């Protein structure tokens, strides 16, 4: 495990897809309506195995509905696999939905504190990094503004800044994240390159 940041061995995941039984016209007219539901089992992932080395950028590709997002959520510990094992080295920060966990009625500063605590960051570290997060997100004039007054681009920049300032061992991205304008995207790419140089993994 020393050379790898992630080890995935024979991971499988199923979900239940529930359906409501259709009511016939006769049942509807007679008032004899019984709400019956049934489900089918969807095999989303089956016996998935791979390793991600430290400092490696690892891409997961596939068709829509092939289980890419489910796999990332398992790596994030949001879902548990039905079978198989996952081992990770160091902190893992998921950026699966930009702004996930943010509250629209809280200010940018308060959301930084809340998000960082959820990511396991100490209060001391949060205080030290808050200014850097605001500066990286280019939101100096909006630190005390509630998120409900942010544009989607502003919220995205804040979420990305929170994730990278945590400095995780593994950063999980759901699809290619286009955050902000061209200048901000260039800044994000430089961060990714620096991550890789310092032995961080990106999935």
Identify the meaning behind each predicted range.
Residues 2-47:
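Pre-NBD coupling/linker segments of ABC/ABC-like ATPases
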Residues 26-34, 113, 125-142:
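Conserved ABC ATPase "signature" region
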Residues 61-63:
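The feature captures the beta-strand-to-loop junction immediately N-terminal to the Walker
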Residues 76:
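Helix-to-loop junction immediately C-terminal to a conserved catalytic motif
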Residues 146-153:
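Conserved ABC ATPase signature
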Residues 162-173, 179:
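A short, proline-enriched helix->beta-strand linker immediately N-terminal to the Walker B motif
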């Amino acid at each position: 495990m020393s050379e790898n940041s992630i080890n995935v061995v024979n991971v499988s995941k199923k979900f239940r897809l529930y359906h409501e039984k259709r009511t016939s016209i006769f049942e509807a007219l007679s008032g004899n309506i019984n709400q019956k539901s049934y489900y089918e089992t969807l095999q989303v992932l089956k016996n998935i195995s791979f390793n991600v080395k430290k400092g490696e950028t690892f891409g997961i590709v596939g068709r829509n509905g092939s289980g890419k997002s489910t796999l990332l959520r398992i790596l994030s510990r949001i879902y548990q696999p039905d079978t198989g094992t996952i081992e990770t080295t160091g902190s893992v920060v998921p950026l699966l939905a930009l702004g996930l966990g943010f509250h629209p009625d809280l200010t940018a500063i308060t959301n930084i504190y809340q998000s960082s605590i959820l990511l396991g960051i100490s209060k001391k570290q949060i205080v030290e990094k808050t200014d850097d997060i605001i500066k990286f997100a280019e939101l100096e004039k909006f630190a005390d503004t509630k998120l409900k007054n942010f544009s989607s681009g502003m919220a995205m920049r804040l979420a990305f800044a929170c994730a990278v300032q945590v400095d995780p061992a593994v950063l999980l991205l759901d699809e290619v994240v286009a955050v902000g304008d061209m200048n901000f995207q260039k800044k994000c790419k430089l961060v990714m390159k620096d991550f890789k140089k310092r032995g961080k993994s990106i999935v």
